[in-house]
């Protein structure tokens, strides 16, 4: 028997994010997923060492690797469309749920039982889910920052929206990252490596 789950996951590299906006550099879902997993792990370490928020860094990082897996089936729905109305938000949530179910069906039952909670977020506590959501937003904020730094004003409003959304989350780990890490994303290689 063949199980196409991982081959389908590999197609994340073909899904372009920010599809309704002019980008100086395209970003694939695969790139975003990796960035989000790295950020989620770091936010968990910040929680562990600085804020005391209980979390499992490895579990959150793995869940981050699968957090947008349903988009392989649904595509990347632009945020303004996804959250335009409660009806659209609910319909998209139902579509995501069905996508997770469809993808899990591409695995043997015992593997599906372990991966489904990573794809649908049920593997996470409320605090861990908040950290993953903050990492997802930070990834978007970093993309907007990079685009703006490249002179692309198409992302100005998105940058403002991402900052406001992060602030509204009242996530001390994200606040720590914004203060101590985000400014480095505007530095050049020599400044980053202090050569």
Could you say what each language-model-derived stretch is?
Residues 1-195:
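Alpha-helical, largely C-terminal catalytic domains
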């Amino acid at each position: 028997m063949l199980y196409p789950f991982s081959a389908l996951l590999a197609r994340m590299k073909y899904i372009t994010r920010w599809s309704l906006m002019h980008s100086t550099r395209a970003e694939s879902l695969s790139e975003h997923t990796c960035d989000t997993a790295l950020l989620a792990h770091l936010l968990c370490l910040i929680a562990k060492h600085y804020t005391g928020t209980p979390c499992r860094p490895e579990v959150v990082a793995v869940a981050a690797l699968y957090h947008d897996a349903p988009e392989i089936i649904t595509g990347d729905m632009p945020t303004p469309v996804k959250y335009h109305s409660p009806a659209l938000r609910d319909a998209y949530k139902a579509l995501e749920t069905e996508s997770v179910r469809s993808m899990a069906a591409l695995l043997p039952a015992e593997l599906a039982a372990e991966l489904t909670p990573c794809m649908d977020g049920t593997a996470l506590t409320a605090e861990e889910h908040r950290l993953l959501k903050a990492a997802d937003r930070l990834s978007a904020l970093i993309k907007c920052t990079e685009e703006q730094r490249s002179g692309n004003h198409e992302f100005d409003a998105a940058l403002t929206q991402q900052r406001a959304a992060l602030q509204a989350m009242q996530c001390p780990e994200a606040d720590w990252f914004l203060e101590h890490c985000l400014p480095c994303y505007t530095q050049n290689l020599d400044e980053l490596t202090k050569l």
